[in-house]
């Protein structure tokens, strides 16, 4: 009877062959095992996350922005919560954010450095909050921003320094605020602006409206609703179309100082006041010294006159020329 194939081989070769076959079988088993699904990004507590870096924290009554955000989050939904303030670096741990939704919160305060680190953010929705003012430079770090909504707040003033230069911003929503005018230069920093929403604001028909009217005539496309925008005349209490005011209607308006000029005035005002005060004090001191000197001279003159009247000194008269005293003096 012939032996098996392994019995004919040397023991060392048989062992090597068995080990090789075992390795092949193990690799086949691993290859046929079901693959695991991709792991979702790190998710903030109480939020739900999905593939693609989306973190859904909507309607959870959150009082603040979650502190455990990660760089894996690309889209953050924080709408319909109770967030009342955005501190400095509120999203510093989520520097890869592309989409940020903060609608329907209780936002009243936004720090000037709240959005620092979000250089790639493209979409920001702050609508339906309680914002009355924003500090200068709030949106300056958001150089990639293409959509910004501030609708449904209580904003009464928007300075150019608040928005800053946003070269890629295409959509700006300012409707349903308390804006009566827009300062000159605010919209000039938005070269790519394609959609501008201005409805629902109490625009006032006065000189402060001139920058907005001028800009709307030069850029009719972004504000497609221009033909229906109305302003209120304070004196006549009538409504007028913003497009009904040409440049000639603002001839009586004096050009207001720019923000840079106002800053110079504010900076030099106290300095000039102190300089004027110092000059006045110096002149007062000089006049006081001159007056005192004149009074001293006057008192000296009066004193000499009194001495002459009480003890006159002078040459002897002709009547006393023959007296012994006079002769002795002359001798």
Curated annotation (Swiss-Prot):
Key word Transmembrane present: yes
Xref: InterPro entries: Cys-rich_flank_reg_C, KCNMA1_auxiliary, Leu-rich_rpt, Leu-rich_rpt_typical-subtyp, LRR_dom_sf
Keyword check for Manganese: no
Segments traversing the membrane: 262-282
Extracellular side: 27-261
Signal peptide: 1-26
GO MF annotations, alphabetized: potassium channel activator activity; potassium channel regulator activity; transmembrane transporter binding; voltage-gated potassium channel activity
LRR repeat ranges per the UniProt record: 72-93, 96-117, 120-141, 144-165, 168-191
Quaternary structure and interacting proteins, as annotated: Interacts with KCNMA1.
Protein name per Swiss-Prot or TrEMBL: Leucine-rich repeat-containing protein 26
Organism: Mus musculus
């Amino acid at each position: 009877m012939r032996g098996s194939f392994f019995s004919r081989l040397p023991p060392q070769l048989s062992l090597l062959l068995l080990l090789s076959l075992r390795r092949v079988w193990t690799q086949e088993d691993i290859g046929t095992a079901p693959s695991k699904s991709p792991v979702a990004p790190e998710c903030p507590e109480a939020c739900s996350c999905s593939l693609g870096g989306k973190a859904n924290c909507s309607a959870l009554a959150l009082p603040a922005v979650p502190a455990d955000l990660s760089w894996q989050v690309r889209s953050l939904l924080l709408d319909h919560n109770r967030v009342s303030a955005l501190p400095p670096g509120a999203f510093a741990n989520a520097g890869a954010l592309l989409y940020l939704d903060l609608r329907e919160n209780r936002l009243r305060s936004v720090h000037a450095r709240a959005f620092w680190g979000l250089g790639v953010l493209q979409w920001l929705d702050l609508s339906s909050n309680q914002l009355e003012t924003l500090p200068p430079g709030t949106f300056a770090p958001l150089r990639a921003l293409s959509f910004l909504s501030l609708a449904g707040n209580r904003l009464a003033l928007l300075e150019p320094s608040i928005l800053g230069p946003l070269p890629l911003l295409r959509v700006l929503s300012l409707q349903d605020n308390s804006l009566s005018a827009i300062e000159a230069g605010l919209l000039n920093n938005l070269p790519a602006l394609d959609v501008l929403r201005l409805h629902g604001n109490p625009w006032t028909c006065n000189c402060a409206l001139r920058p907005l009217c001028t800009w709307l005539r030069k850029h009719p496309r972004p504000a497609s609703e221009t033909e229906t925008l109305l302003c209120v005349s304070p004196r006549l209490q009538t409504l007028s179309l913003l497009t009904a005011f040409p440049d000639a209607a603002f001839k009586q308006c004096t050009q207001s100082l720019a923000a840079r000029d106002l800053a110079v005035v504010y900076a030099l005002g106290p300095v000039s006041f102190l300089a004027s005060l110092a000059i006045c004090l110096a002149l007062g001191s000089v006049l006081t010294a001159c007056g005192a000197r004149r009074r001293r001279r006057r008192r000296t003159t009066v004193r000499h006159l009194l001495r002459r009247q009480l003890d006159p000194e002078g040459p002897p008269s002709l009547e006393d020329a023959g007296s012994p005293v006079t002769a002795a003096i002359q001798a």
